[in-house]
Every structure is written in C-alpha cells, then in structure tokens.
C-alpha cells in the first residue's frame, strides 16, 4: 500500500483514510456490469431464480429455455423427459435436458457435477452416443461457456441479431467453487477440450483465474491439459 506524503497530521490522516476506503471498496464491491438482459445459464428459469444474483458480478441467471426461445423461436422443447421407446423397440430411461423433435436436436447443460466424477464423464459420452444413434444432433453447453452471439453461432449455426451474454464476463471463480480445482482428471481433460473450441471464452476465464490463488483455481493443472 502506498501512503501519501505527510503535509500535516490532519491532511495526511484524511488522505490515508480516503485511500484505505478506496482499496476496501475495490476488494468488497462485485465486478461492475452494465444492465444485462441475459445472465449466467442455468438448466431452467426456476433454477436460475433460485440461484439468485451472482455475488462476484452482480449478474442474474437465465434459464436455458429462455435462450432457446430466442435461438429457435416457434419451436417446442421437451424438458427432462425420458428418451423412451424408439422405433427399433429399445426403451431408455435417460432424460436429456431439452429435446426438439422438429429439429431432431438435443441440448444438454453440463454443470460442475459433470466434471467432478469420471463415471459421469463416461455416462455423458454413452448417452450422447445413444441419442446420435437415433438421428439426433447433440449440443452440450458447459457451465463455463456462456451463450454469447459468437458461441451460439458456433454451437447451433444460428445468428441471433440481439446481444446475448456479454463476452467479457468470466464464468469461473474461487468464490463460486466452480474452478478446475474442483474437477477430476477426466473432467479437466474434457474441460480443456471444450475450452479450446471457444478461444475467446477460454481467454476471459483464464485471465480471471490468473488473479486468484492457484490452490483454489487449479489453473496450473488445467494448463497442462490445454497444451
């Protein structure tokens, strides 16, 4: 901390107090964001509202169904329903997050739990293979990748004219306990592969993690998988 040069006891004390308050405010005030219509993704709007406001950014959450309604207007989505019996007679209890029969499209939102246990990573791959076997395209949205206009174009091949999530806001922080440090090796490998697909999102998240304690971010471990 740089202390102001003393001119008198009173003026120096006042300057020191103002400087100290400024530093404390910088540490305690969440990242300032402009008013955003679109927030961090949650599987549903109900879960988004339960999660409330993100303490780091002051930004709300937005249910995936609201994003889908803008990306694919006038289409019907089936949420969290068993895949059921297929044309070949095989029956499945697995439940994709969102399924659109008209588009033959399945959209999965993968939260932190999908990166913490190797059996979950394996199960996701197995389920995706089943969906694809029956002619569905599967789009997976990792919790650390937000639906910016560029990401939507990459994932869905759709150009949305209105601004979506701001590309400048990171998705991971030690405070939220959703960093690479909380992932298993299989999850880290998967995370690295997915981040490479979105260089801009990778850059903004890596930059944010660099400013925090590596013990709590696990950035140095993730970087080994990114090589």
Model regions and ranges:
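Nucleic-acid endo/exonuclease domains
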Residues: 2-227
């Amino acid at each position: 901390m740089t202390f102001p040069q003393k001119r008198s006891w009173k003026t120096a004390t006042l300057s020191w107090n103002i400087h100290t308050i400024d530093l404390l405010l910088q540490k305690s005030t969440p990242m300032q964001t402009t008013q955003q219509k679109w927030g961090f993704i949650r599987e549903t709007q109900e879960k988004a509202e339960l999660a409330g406001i993100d303490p780091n950014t002051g930004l709300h959450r937005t249910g995936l169904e609201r994003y889908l309604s803008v990306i694919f207007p006038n289409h019907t989505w089936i949420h969290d329903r068993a895949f059921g019996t297929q044309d070949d007679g095989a029956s499945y209890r697995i439940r994709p997050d969102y399924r659109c029969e008209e588009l033959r499209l399945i959209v999965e939102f993968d939260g932190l739990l999908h990166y913490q246990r190797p059996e979950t990573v394996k199960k996701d791959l197995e389920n995706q293979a089943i969906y694809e076997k029956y002619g569905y395209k599967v789009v997976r949205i990792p919790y650390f990748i937000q639906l910016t206009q560029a990401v939507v174009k990459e994932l869905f091949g759709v150009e949305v004219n209105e601004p979506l999530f701001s590309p400048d806001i990171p998705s991971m922080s030690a405070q939220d306990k959703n960093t690479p440090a909380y992932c298993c090796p299989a999850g880290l490998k998967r995370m690295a592969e997915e981040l490479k697909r979105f260089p801009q999102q990778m850059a903004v998240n890596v930059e944010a993690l660099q400013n925090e304690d590596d013990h709590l971010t696990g950035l140095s471990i993730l970087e080994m998988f990114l090589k």
